[in-house]
UniProtKB/Swiss-Prot annotation:
Organism taxonomic ancestry: Eukaryota, Metazoa, Chordata, Craniata, Vertebrata
Organism the protein comes from: Homo sapiens (Human)
Function: Guanyl-nucleotide exchange factor that activates RHO-like proteins and connects extracellular signals to cytoskeletal activities. Activates RAC1, CDC42, and to a lesser extent RHOA and their downstream signaling to regulate processes like cell adhesion and cell migration.
Disease: Neurodevelopmental disorder with language delay and seizures: An autosomal recessive disorder characterized by global developmental delay, intellectual disability, speech delay, and seizures. Additional features may include axial hypotonia, peripheral hypertonia, hypothyroidism, and non-specific dysmorphic features or brain imaging abnormalities.
Protein name: Rho guanine nucleotide exchange factor TIAM1
Segments of skewed composition (Acidic residues): 977-990
Domain PH: 434-549, 1261-1397
Family indicated by similarity: Belongs to the TIAM family.
Outcome, altering R678C: In a colorectal cancer sample; somatic mutation
Length: 1591
């Protein structure tokens, strides 16, 4: 047949007679000699025919015996003869019943628990075929395969004590049946399954001879022709050494060793004594699992002995061409190994390409000899490699395995070849489709070596092949390069390209049109094409094939849509991990404990690796998307920028800094250990249900439905006895204690009946279950499956959210239906239920309030559990005497919200604060009440004769995931401070959390994520599964809008609480201490007091705005939120300038580290900080509190943007929110600008304050929050004392509320001159600010220039008036602005602070008056703003305090819609009721009396938001001068006749204006006073006829 081993088998088994068989005697057809030999029972069922060109599958494929019977042949003969098979026509007849296998791609979600189902010798009934020899020549097979003996005692003291396997590959052995063996590999104890195919050497030839010597001692045993291998027990041997299952010949060396792993490091030198070997019972069926090493079948070996000894040496099985010193040896030098894999490669491949059990999950590895089959059409693909790598992956001693597998040289590393990916059954035909073919030059580039290292391939030589891309595999054919291949060509090599990245290599020094392919195994290859077009076509073809494989795995047809969704998920993951990493780095800077630092560093390292993996996957998917859309590939520079330092070091060691090397390093790192650890920890049930076909989703993964719904007799006819028998051999190793010994009894093999064998798997009894929509379906519950496992499986299959449903069992007891709700971790396999019900949970709102008595407690405890990356809150226990029990709270309920705050956004400190409050609002998801007449079982009936419990479930409800327990039963929780209510449960759980991320890190991240998260992302950082996406889709825009509004309010309340805590915990105590000066306190806290007052006021306006709609929770349409959105947006617009308070705080924040570093040297300061944070939580440190204002001010635009995105683009509120977003962005820009100014000129401002003389400083502070304007002006009259000027100097002019500052700063030329002359000492002392001058507001005047063109020339005159008491002369500054507009702005700012000065004198107060209170907005776009004062820049123009209080009271009554809440004395009570029909415009007009502004169509909204004083004039109209005299006259009348009822509020308000105008005339006449009057008519601030303007 062309295989050296096969010929050697003939030689050893049949004697010298067959030794000289050449290629013509062993063709690729299945030939049988006329000699009568042992009969083999062919496994019934479906037979898999491998074909690389086309791969299809039929659910009703007949087995080989069926095919024979249908074609008039007798399948089996009791006397063991098969005379009819002597004719070559047998091949054609048999081939009619063969169908190829399909593949299912699962590389995206790798799993170790692959359920590879193997056949038991499909063609054992053909004695003279090579399959027969495969079974018969046990010693020959063993001799090459390993020649090792190992003891085995897992299933008895004498069961399979030794094992040696000869590696053999047969042509027609490719004809497998993937499920005839009927056992799932994941159902086996994978701890003891491995192989000894690792290391072979020619020095062990005598072991081979011993093996041959033992061959004739075995006694065959046959099963009847009607039997089949339906479980692993079918393959188990009896204790009688002469008996072999299924008639296979017994061999002393044929025992299957299941605990080889412990002996693998010593395989090379370990040999058992022959005496021990002779007592070994045989287990011959392992011989049907051929070696993963492949051999070329295109050439035979003239010397079989040399062939079998050399071709299998080392991890790399060289082809026979290598041995025969032909063209093949040259190929060995090329670095492209044959169809071989090493241990590490198989481990990695198992991780990268998991497969769960399904009828199409047979995995095939394409090797150099796999193309040889009975028909010789093309490369057949065998499943043997699968079993081998699964055995290696499932071992528990992975370290020993890796050590043994990696003990070879670089030349033996075989990371070149991989298996074709699995595919969906519906897309099987595409597997063999040739996507691209052509002549390529190939060279090995990078090789994944042991210990997850990637190294340059040592044997690198360009080799020319004809390359064909079929599915996700590149097949290499030997060709002259000018012509293609025919259908009989055999691929020499194959490269697995699934999940690969292809990049052009234009920088190759010697060749053109080179591209590099790096796959998910950590290997890379170079290819050279003939042209640039061909290069691009190859890249597109490979990427397109990979994209199709991704879609095939996800069972999606729309590949583009899938890729875009995966890209979006990856971006969310990247964003999440970047925030986590930043928070970890921030925490690292403040942690001093070495253990904590190490934990944080380890976690940061994990995040870095995760980010690299996510970025690589993101780049890969973008490459696939670009290939499908015909676009340009993504820029690799951006990907390489994310490489961490260790990765860069590794790439530097390779000397290759490219996407290919980056991908290889990441794949080598994650493909072997990370995936293995993750997948080995998965439960068996979870791994089995990964890769299913959509047509089988209604069934369990391990069940195969051949025809309609089975009858009860068909499903349950076998009873529990058959189940018990089939489980005895399969589940004996599932128990975690692998050393437990159990007698293996060969069960009776069930007779196969294709007509009634509906469920073909281990005789598991399927269970009916009923979905919430009363739809029945079937599933299989296995031993060890918990209620949680079953619920998750069913919900995932039917796209349900498992957290919103629960599992209920129906029992029929005494003809009465009873129900039972199992615990999540309860094993339901043991329960004798009649039916499973999937029932939806209900959502309830519970409000609990404590009374003043100390005996009242909530009486429940919470557990926070992280499930699939989502943190959930569950009720752990409920006390019967507590308030929670009286309200109906039950243990096991899931808490969705606490006080309108989503549970997944709460950390431990927040939960503690909530539980300490006197009232608690809970939104819980609980079980509904039972229907009437239905009883609930307490102790359901269990199986009596079923198999014993095989171990605890791998999933535990509260122990398998990190979490913490919170108890709300603090005795004095209502009286103690929030920070002091942390209970003992919380502390102990914090220690648990610290082992992974540390409590401080979790708390800091949860809080910062709430502050920094820019979008309403899903709560899970992992990939969103189907049920989660379905749940997210169920949220309407109204629900999302409500959620964002609640988030805005809740985070604002939390922020205000944090600010108060900062003041109470740090600011006030520090003011009483002496270790910090007042200046240092100012640096730390700045204007914190003003910020707290403002935020309290702002929070109140937000709350009042939300209360505009009393039934906010019931709104179902977005347009119903109109009033609320206008109010919220108006709040930000109205207080936009007030937010500039933050500029001072943020500017001084840069100095905070310099002050806090004092704690390192000042023990008293350090002791104070420790005392204020006794639990040493990072979230409670002073630094953490001081950063919150900066985080919050940057959060506002993000929250507004979320509201903006959820509104209708054509609606008025959409525009309104857009303006609010832009305004808050301007505030953020202003804060950033102020911070830059402070960094540059802050020292000058401090020096000017310090240089003031006199007992009382005229200017107390130059705060950045008081800076109204900064600009550059030219000083036209500089004094001669400052030196000569080549041109007029430019001054930086700053207009503060308390002073005007002029500063001249030398340019960079002077600095360069000094540095260039090496006068460093002078440079250090040199002050760049040559001139600085401060003019307090009290001594400031603005004079009009006499020249007519002064305004046109943008010149103004600022005067620092003289002071006789200080002996200061008058000083005049002639300043030229950059433009007339700039001059206008400058003078406007100066006039505003002068007006503020006059107003303070009028009110005889030193402090600025309180700001005008908020009035809610609604209705027409910005109508309510048209009469409003633009806020902060004219905050100094507020009225008196008494007037402000009166207006605040009236405004409060105004925006309270609830009639019960409106005071009976409200002058506008009748206007408080909103219209029932939703006529917002009419209601707003009534509320705000907007009729007087309707005619002002020329007013721009930008004017409303600006600081223009001229806007005030536009509001008053164009006839201000004409109306002024009339208004003053009305004012005098109002003063004489104050008590008259005809006096209206407009005239009385003008009395106030008269006083202001009179005082404003100090610096000018009545004309200038009229310009500076800024009060705007707002009839809505006070009722007519009741406003008293007396001051």
């Amino acid at each position: 047949m062309g295989n050296a081993e096969s010929q050697h088998v003939e030689h050893e088994f049949y004697g010298e007679k067959h030794a000289s068989l050449g290629r013509k005697h062993t063709s690729r057809s299945l030939r049988l000699s006329h000699k009568t030999r042992r009969t083999r029972h062919a496994s019934s069922g479906k037979v898999i025919h491998r074909n690389s060109e086309v791969s299809t599958r039929s659910s009703s494929t007949p087995s080989i015996p069926q095919s024979l019977a249908e074609n008039g042949l007798e399948p089996f003969s009791q006397d063991g003869t098969l005379e009819d098979f002597g004719s070559p026509i047998w091949v054609d007849r048999v081939d009619m019943g063969l169908r190829p296998v399909s593949y299912t791609d699962s590389s995206v979600t790798p799993s170790v628990d692959s359920s590879i189902v193997l056949t038991a010798a499909s063609v054992q009934s053909m004695p003279d075929t090579e399959e027969s020899r495969l079974y018969g020549d046990d010693a020959t097979y063993l001799a090459e395969g390993g020649r090792r003996q190992h003891s085995y005692t897992s299933n008895g003291p004498t069961f399979m004590e030794t094992a040696s396997f000869k590696k053999k590959r047969s042509k027609s052995a490719d004809i497998w049946r993937e499920d005839s063996l009927e056992f799932s590999l994941s159902d086996l104890s994978q701890e003891h399954l491995t192989s000894n195919e690792e290391i072979l050497g020619s020095a062990e030839e005598k072991d081979c001879e011993e093996a041959r010597g033992m061959e004739t001692r075995a006694s065959p045993r046959q099963l009847s022709t009607c039997q089949r291998a339906n479980s692993l027990g079918d393959l188990y041997a009896q204790k009688n050494s002469g008996v072999t299952a299924n008639g296979g010949p017994g061999s002393k060396f044929a025992g299957y060793c299941r605990n080889l792993v412990s002996d693998i490091p010593n395989l090379a030198n370990h040999k058992m004594p022959p005496a021990a070997a002779e007592e070994t019972p045989p287990y011959s069926n392992y011989n049907t699992l051929p070696c993963r090493k492949s051999h070329c079948l295109s050439e035979g070996a003239t010397n079989p002995q040399i062939s079998h000894s050399n071709s299998m040496q080392g991890r790399r099985a060289k082809t026979t061409q290598d041995v025969n010193a032909g063209e093949g040896s040259e190929f060995a030098d090329s670095g492209i190994e044959g169809a071989t894999t090493d241990t590490d490669l198989l481990s990695r491949r198992s991780n990268a390409t998991n497969s769960s059990y399904s009828p199409t999950t047979g995995r095939a590895f394409v090797g150099s000899d796999s193309g040889s089959s009975s028909t010789g059409d093309a490369a057949r693909q065998g499943v043997y490699e699968n079993f081998r790598r699964e055995l290696e992956m499932s071992t528990t001693n992975s370290e020993s395995l890796e050590e043994a597998g990696s003990a070879h040289s670089d030349e033996q590393s075989s990371g070149t070849l991989s298996s074709p990916g699995q595919s969906d059954i519906l897309l099987t035909a595409a597997q063999g489709t040739v996507r691209k073919a052509g002549a390529l030059a190939v060279k090995n580039f990078l090789v994944h070596k042991k210990n997850k290292k990637v190294e340059s391939a040592t044997r690198r030589k360009w080799k020319h092949y004809w390359v064909s891309l079929k599915g996700c595999t590149l097949f290499f054919y030997e060709s002259d390069g000018r012509s293609g291949i025919d259908h009989n060509s055999i691929p020499k090599h194959a490269v697995w390209v699934e999940n690969s990245i292809v990049q052009a290599v234009p920088e190759h020094p010697k060749k053109d049109f080179v591209f590099c392919l790096s796959n998910s195994l950590g290997d890379a290859f170079l290819f050279q094409t003939t042209s640039q077009t061909e290069l691009e076509n190859w890249i597109t073809a490979i990427h397109s094939a990979c994209a199709t494989a991704v879609a095939r795995h996800h069972h999606k047809e729309d590949t583009l849509r899938l890729l875009k969704s995966e890209i979006k998920k990856l971006e969310q993951k990247i964003d999440m991990d970047e925030k986590m990493k930043k928070m970890g780095e921030m925490q690292l800077s403040s942690v001093t404990d070495s253990k904590k630092k190490k934990t944080i560093l380890d976690q940061i390292f994990v995040w870095e690796q995760n980010l690299e993996q996510f970025q690589m996957d993101l780049f890969r998917f973008r490459c696939y998307l670009a290939s499908l859309q015909g676009g340009e590939l993504p820029n690799p520079k951006r990907l390489l920028a994310f490489a961490s330092r260790p990765t860069k070091v590794a790439m530097g060691r390779l000397g290759i800094f490219s996407v290919s090397s980056f991908h290889a390093l990441v794949a080598a790192r994650t493909g072997e250990t990370g995936v293995r650890r993750r997948t080995q920890a998965m439960s068996r049930s979870a791994s089995k249900r990964r890769s299913r076909f959509s047509s089988l989703w209604g069934l369990d993964t391990t069940s195969k439905k051949k025809q309609g719904r089975p009858s009860i007799n068909q499903v349950f006819g076998e009873g529990t006895e058959a189940v018990k028998k089939s489980l005895e051999g399969i589940f004996d190793d599932i128990v975690p204690d692998g050393k437990r010994e159990k007698e293996v009894v060969l069960p009776n093999v069930h007779q196969h009946n294709p007509d009634c064998d509906i469920w073909v798997h281990e005789y598991f009894t399927p269970s009916w279950f009923c979905l919430p929509n009363n739809q029945p379906a079937l599933t299989v519950v296995r031993p060890g499956d918990t209620a949680r496992d079953t619920l998750e499986l069913i919900c995932k299959t039917h796209q349900l959210d498992h957290s919103a449903h629960y599992l209920r069992l129906k029992f029929l007891i005494e003809n009465k239906m009873q129900l039972y709700v199992p615990q999540p971790e309860e094993d339901i396999y043991e329960l004798l239920y009649k039916e499973i019900e999937i029932c939806p949970k209900v959502t309830q709102s519970i409000h609990i309030e404590k009374s003043d008595t100390a005996a009242d407690t909530y009486g429940f405890s919470l557990s926070s559990v992280e499930e699939d990356g989502i943190r959930r809150l569950y009720v752990n226990s409920v006390k019967e005497t507590g308030l929670a029990s009286k309200k109906g709270l039950k243990a096991g309920d899931e808490i969705l919200e606490i006080n309108n705050r989503a549970a997944d956004a709460l950390n431990s400190s927040m939960l503690k604060d909530f539980l300490s409050q006197p009232s608690l609002g809970l939104l819980v998801r609980t079980y509904p009440e039972l229907e009437e007449g239905v009883e609930l079982l307490e102790s359901p009936p269990h199986r009596v004769d079923g198999p014993a419990d095989l171990g605890e479930s791998p999933l535990a409800f509260l122990t398998s995931n990190p979490g913490h327990s919170l108890c709300s039963e603090q005795g004095s929780s209502a009286e103690t401070a929030p920070e002091e209510t942390e209970g003992p449960d919380l502390e102990s759980s914090d220690e648990t959390d610290h082992s992974s991320k540390s409590t401080e890190q979790v708390a800091a991240f949860c809080r910062s994520l709430h502050e920094m998260n820019p979008s309403d992302q899903s709560p899970s950082p992992q990939d969103s599964t189907g049920p989660q996406l379905a749940t997210m889709r169920q949220l309407s825009d109204a629900d999302k809008l409500r959620k964002v509004i609640c988030e805005l309010l809740e985070t604002e309340r939390t922020y205000v609480k944090d600010l108060n805590c900062l003041m109470e915990r740090y600011l006030k105590p520090l003011q009483k201490e002496t270790f910090l000066t007042q200046d240092e306190l100012d640096v730390l806290f700045g204007n914190l007091t003003e910020m707290v007052e403002f935020q309290v006021e702002f929070l109140k306006t937000l709350e009042d705005g939300v209360r505009l709609v009393p039934d906010l929770e019931k709104l179902e349409k977005v347009d119903q939120f109109k009033k609320v959105l206008f109010s919220l947006g108006g709040s930000f617009l109205y207080y936009a300038d007030r937010f500039k308070l933050y500029s001072a705080f943020c500017a001084s924040h840069t100095k905070v580290p310099k002050v806090l570093v004092k704690a390192k040297t000042d023990t008293a300061f350090k002791a104070f900080l420790d005392a204020q944070n006794p639990k040493q939580q990072h979230s409670s440190t002073l630094e953490s509190y001081l950063i919150k204002p900066i985080q919050r001010i940057l959060k506002y635009p993000l929250l507004l943007r979320e509201l903006f995105a959820l509104t209708d683009a054509e609606s008025e509120e959409h525009y309104h929110l857009d303006v609010a977003i832009k305004t808050m962005n301007k505030v953020a820009s202003h804060i950033n600008e102020m911070q830059k100014i402070h960094e540059e000129f802050g020292a000058v401002f401090d020096q000017l304050i310090a240089e003031q003389t006199g007992e009382k400083k005229e200017v107390a502070d130059l705060s950045m929050g008081d800076l109204l304007l900064h600009t550059t002006v030219i000083w036209l009259n500089p004094p001669a004392s400052l030196g000569k000027w080549k041109k007029e100097p430019e001054l930086a002019a700053f207009v503060f509320k308390t002073a005007v500052v002029l500063v001249y700063k030398d340019g960079s030329k002077q600095k360069k001159k000094l540095v260039g002359s090496h006068r460093l000492s002078i440079y250090e002392d040199w002050d760049p600010f040559r001139f600085r001058h401060m003019i307090p507001t009290e001594a400031l005047q603005v004079r009009a220039l006499a020249s007519a063109d002064a305004e046109a020339n943008a010149v103004c005159e600022i005067v620092h008036v003289k002071s006789e008491s200080e002996g200061r002369p008058e000083r005049v500054f002639h300043l030229c602005c950059s433009s007339p507009e700039s001059r206008k702005d400058f003078l406007k700012a100066v006039h505003s602070i002068l007006r503020d000065k006059h107003r303070r004198q009028l009110l005889k107060t030193e402090s600025l008056p309180s700001s005008q209170q908020y009035v809610p907005f609604g209705g027409k776009r910005l109508c309510a703003l048209k009469g409003a004062r633009p806020a902060m820049s004219r905050a100094v123009s507020a009225p008196s305090k008494s007037l402000g209080r009166r207006r605040r009271r009236l405004a409060r009554n105004r925006f309270t819609i609830d009639s019960d809440a409106v005071s009976a004395s409200s002058p506008e009570k009748e206007s408080q009721q909103p219209p029932g029909g939703g006529d917002t415009d009419r209601w707003v007009e009534e509320q705000f009396d907007l009729a007087q502004y309707e005619e002002q169509d020329d007013i721009k909204e930008t004017d409303i938001l600006s600081d223009d004083d001229e806007f005030c004039e536009s509001v008053k109209g164009a006839s201000v001068d004409r109306d002024l005299q009339e208004r003053l006259q009305a004012t005098s009348i109002s003063q004489r006749e104050r008590g008259r009822k005809t006096l209206d509020s407009h005239a009385s308000r003008m009395a106030q204006l008269k006083k202001q105008a009179a005082l404003s005339g100090i610096n000018g006449g009545l004309e200038s006073a009229s310009e500076e009057v800024i009060w705007v008519r707002r009839e809505d601030f006070a009722p007519s006829r009741k406003l008293n303007t007396e001051i």
